[in-house]
Regions:
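Conserved Nudix-box catalytic region and its N-terminal flanking loop in Nudix hydrolases
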Residues: 19-59, 70-71
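Glycine-rich phosphate-binding active-site loops on the catalytic face of alpha/beta enzymes
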Residues: 164, 210-218, 244-258, 283-312
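NUDIX/MutT-family hydrolases
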Residues: 86-88, 96-129
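Alpha-helix-loop-beta-strand connector modules within alpha/beta enzyme cores
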Residues: 173-194, 210-213, 218-230, 258-285
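Conserved N-terminal beta-strand and adjoining loop/helix that marks the start
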Residues: 1-20, 72
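Active-site mouth loops of central-metabolism enzymes
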Residues: 130-144, 223-228
Length: 312
């Protein structure tokens, strides 16, 4: 087993139609014949972003205009250890082509599961399929929940967790049915909190509370996230092959005034120890998105984060 780590910069590149660019590794290369996200190893003295710009120019002939951090993945193949520094690239000049003779394809995100990728790429696929915003839907009344749901949609939230801890039990079933109908109409992904006991309401998956995560023996079906507060919980979410985790609290929050906030650097240190997309939660506003991404988060999660009066 080698102790050297190969540091690679790679990109999830999207075109104007939302399609993702993938390329095929040469047959003679490590993990040959498999598909991957374009990129390559860092040269001496390069930053990951500098390497990304150079590699995409050399490999697929495009000039990167903007790039945002997506996820870092550490993987040990036995004969090779890699650190994949992955970025989202949505703005670029030029038309992609296989400069090194490699096959490439533009595919819809949902087609990623149809292609064979190296094992280290699997967390990247999870991150590529997730948005930057994760709304947690709560409210004290039916009207408040539905109003907040509409505000989430106006803020561009396309992934919602229905929690409803503050709503009277007798109202939860009816509200859940209404929210599900709204989400289906707007093509928004809806996860049900694991503590909700509802009949005949099937969302797109489940969000495990930290308590439910601790007792989980097998990954539930559908899209699955989990609430985490410690490295141990993050590692458990990773072990269960969940799609993502939510780490909290990052900043001081009025809803949990006694909870000690992690802060950005400790959050980053925790996230870098797991190969899993992780949303930042707690005391955050929309203006914190760039800070969250720069510190390794998938994006922002929140209740009040996406409400108009608190989003700036």
């Amino acid at each position: 087993m080698t102790t050297d780590v190969l540091h690679v910069a790679a990109a999830v590149i999207r075109d104007g139609n939302g399609r993702i660019l993938i390329t095929q590794r040469a047959k003679h290369a490590h993990q040959g014949g498999l598909w991957e996200f374009p990129g390559g190893k860092l040269e001496a003295g390069e930053t990951p972003q500098q390497a990304l710009v150079r590699e995409l120019r050399e490999e697929v002939g495009i000039e990167v205009k903007t790039a945002q951090p997506l996820i870092k993945v550490r993987h040990d193949y036995g004969d090779r250890r890699v650190l994949l520094d992955v970025w989202s690239v949505n703005e670029f000049d030029g038309e992609a082509w296989g400069c090194e003779g490699q096959a490439l394809q533009w595919i819809a995100p949902q087609q990623l599961s149809d292609f064979a990728f190296p094992a280290a790429n699997l967390p990247i696929i999870k991150a590529a399929l997730l948005p930057s915003y994760y709304g947690i839907l709560e409210g004290n009344s039916v009207e408040q929940v539905l109003t907040r749901c509409q505000q989430f949609l106006q803020a561009g939230v396309s992934l919602i967790q229905l929690r409803l801890k503050s709503l009277p039990i007798e109202n939860r079933q009816a509200v859940a049915e209404q929210v599900l109908a709204i989400c289906q109409h707007r093509s928004v992904t809806l996860l049900l909190n694991s503590d909700l006991q509802l009949a005949d309401v099937q969302g797109d998956g489940v969000h495990l509370s930290s308590r439910a995560l601790q007792s989980c023996q097998q990954r539930p079906e559908g899209l699955v996230g989990a609430s985490c507060h410690t490295l141990e919980e993050l590692r458990l979410a990773e072990k269960l092959a969940l799609d993502f985790a939510v780490l909290a609290p990052i900043q001081p929050t009025s809803t949990h005034p006694d909870a000690k906030p992690l802060g950005w650097q400790p959050m980053r240190a925790l996230i870098e120890q797991v190969n899993l997309p992780v949303y930042a939660l707690g005391g955050l506003r929309l203006a914190d998105l760039d800070q969250a991404l720069a510190n390794g988060a998938q994006g922002l999660a929140g209740i009040s984060t996406f409400l108009m009066e608190n989003s700036q």
